């Protein structure tokens, strides 16, 4: 599509319409922009008044002397055609009438019928051989009409050409021998005067030559041929046979006809005589117009075509529509009549169309696809040497002109085909296709042999155009006020325009040029533009210098980011592996790094301060328990991470230091936020009398800190530490990244953890007071109140408070609070248990409270896990309360359970051992004990020996109150006595099966003067005695060897509990006995058994 309008002097070129250039001096460029290539001035499509008058005369003459029926889509009325010509030539009515009258007075042309006899098929075979030797006689009969009106209803004509048309006006074709389907393809020009009473006659004859009978019999093939011989014998010798005729009225013909006509007979004999293919064209000879007399017909038609197409395009522009290449019916009719009357060949018509369209395309706006049809027609009909020398020069000039103009459009394709217009890509692609097809033509190769290949020409045009476009953009971005900041902003705008242009080349234009010409526009444009950009950026950074202000730093950062984006386009070009001017461009920005980092921190700090100041410390919603400042802080940190990713500094060592700075600033901001948010909480709660509101704010503060800790924990992923570690692996010492970045992160997390724990500790302290009060009340409740009822106030208090905290704290902080409360609760319970050691009732309440508190803090898996609940303190308290809540007899039983366990674990016989056999006979309810012996007893007498005996008692005594203790015989001076004595105890089996039930064997050294000395004790559990574990009577009873043990010298916890129960006589008796035994054991130097 052309871009120059009809009058370059009146309307500015399209290029200057698309890009408004600011005219000002360029002072800050060291290299002036190159001189722009001059715009191609296309040849004017307007004619001089004299030329237009001659052409108008010839066009009117064509309409006035129209011949034949109109074509189906053509205009019938001459007045309409004359009116159209008046508009197309912009002729005033008066001038039109004068010219029309003058044309009417001109001499009429000689009317001619150009008849071409192409061929025939299916004609009659008149010769003996079954074939004919056909030829045609044709001419025009003047003054006699053809009856019947139309050709379809005419009667058969018995008259023949030789009888109706003078011989000098009769034309004859060649004779085609021996065929039924002759081909002539001969053309004849037949003149006539009046089309209304003229008719075309064509007779087809079979040439008859004189042959002998012998020759004819030799050609005989069947009986039908024999009949022909007899018929010819009756005919005069040398008389030709009639094959058929075609008679047409000229006024029934169109300007051009191309049809098959049936051959009509003179009689009813053989009505089907075949068909004849005829072509007709009604033409003029000796036209009286000045243009026809002075100029070749081809030239006149070319000018007429150019004038009418120009008018068609202008009419569409006036209606704000684009011409699609279709001529109006009026224009098509006039051009068809003119070409027909001038007898222009199809080739010359195509050539005229090409010359006219190629000229008009350079000055009017219409689709370049209109050029494809004449190109194709010329290529199809091209024959070398067909054109005269001047026509060849004209055609070569049109090729050269269109190629030059097309290249100028391609050079300026960014402005000529803007993407803001939807059909621009299609228009450019159409232009390229036209140029490709033109350069591939045989005519182009012969007439323009020295033209460089089209891809080379287009590539050079694109390179030049890209450079010109860059300099135009550079001028467009020149600031009104000269200065370094303004120059930086202008350069940034220029780089962004370059990036946008490259994106357009990549997405749209590259595909068009590659598919059409195999040219990679994007790679070429990237190579050219990156070099131009690199030079200007380097010059600018040099002017800025090493001291970078905050304002200049922001400008340089945006410029750096834009250059990164520009360099990333390298991967899409063919230059990805080459050396580019923008390689290592980051070095030009090194002085600006401190300014960038400081500005990033300052902006983030200001945003944090602003966010905290506007925070009302209210949760964002039911599911979001932190406040607005936490969200703003997360966004702030995300922006810092985004800035770090944008920076993505190429140098590994410097990138590491930049990352260290980012992490340091982020951690510092986190701690600053903690201080600010706590101060904000104090500010908001200072005037609050409602402690619940203060607790709410404290919960929000703690949640905000927890949210901050989660955000900080994502720093390694957001700043891509793993990728950084791989990059700096060859530069830094091993472990340096871990020691630096991770140490900073852990320090910040530790600080946040401390702040969170402090906040949670404050919340816990508010609850701990209430927990301690309820536990104290629990201990002091009346004895008549059931334990389950006594703990209700404590449990309700915890339910309300913990539900509140669970609602207002995030899960992590709520778990931390539960841990603190649980630890404190255990501490309070331990203190209460210690103060109530002597009260089994109070201890039982505490025991039940501990069980319920464990369930409460576990909360069916929603609270603390069992591992966190079952601490050492909990387990010790649980054991202590289990003991304290027990009765005296239960404690005595537990004591014996403990001694039985001690007996089972003792393997050393340093105190000696006793051997017994015990069994139980359920039928007799008798426990039978055989005390066999003792061995390795300690010598307790001064003589180095002992007088041992064994005391047997069933314990606990409250289970066996009726059974008295038994004793063995005393053995003098014997450390290995053999007792061999049997004892029977009448006792039911049930008490013997209870836990703690045992046979206590106390080995004593008999002392005549004083109290007996204790050798040791042994405990035989009764539930293990044969006969008690089952219903069967015991058989062979095994011996049991029991090492002797001492009671613990420091006292037993159970004995201490029993000792504290002063009012329980049974407990006091038991304690005195066990204390006496412990005292006896402590008098010996040997260490007691563990």
Swiss-Prot record:
Membrane topology classification: Peripheral membrane protein
Tell me which Gene3D superfamilies the record gives.
Answer: 1.10.357.50, 1.20.58.1100, C2 domain
Family annotation (SMART domains): C2 (SM00239)
Q: What is this protein called?
A: Protein unc-13 homolog D
Where in the numbering of this chain does the MHD2 domain appear?
788-895
Gene name tied to this protein: UNC13D
Offer an example of a GO molecular function term for this protein. metal ion binding
Q: What does this protein do?
A: Plays a role in cytotoxic granule exocytosis in lymphocytes. Required for both granule maturation and granule docking and priming at the immunologic synapse. Regulates assembly of recycling and late endosomal structures, leading to the formation of an endosomal exocytic compartment that fuses with perforin-containing granules at the immunologic synapse and licences them for exocytosis. Regulates Ca(2+)-dependent secretory lysosome exocytosis in mast cells.
- Tell me its cofactors: Ca(2+)
Modification Phosphoserine, positions:
150
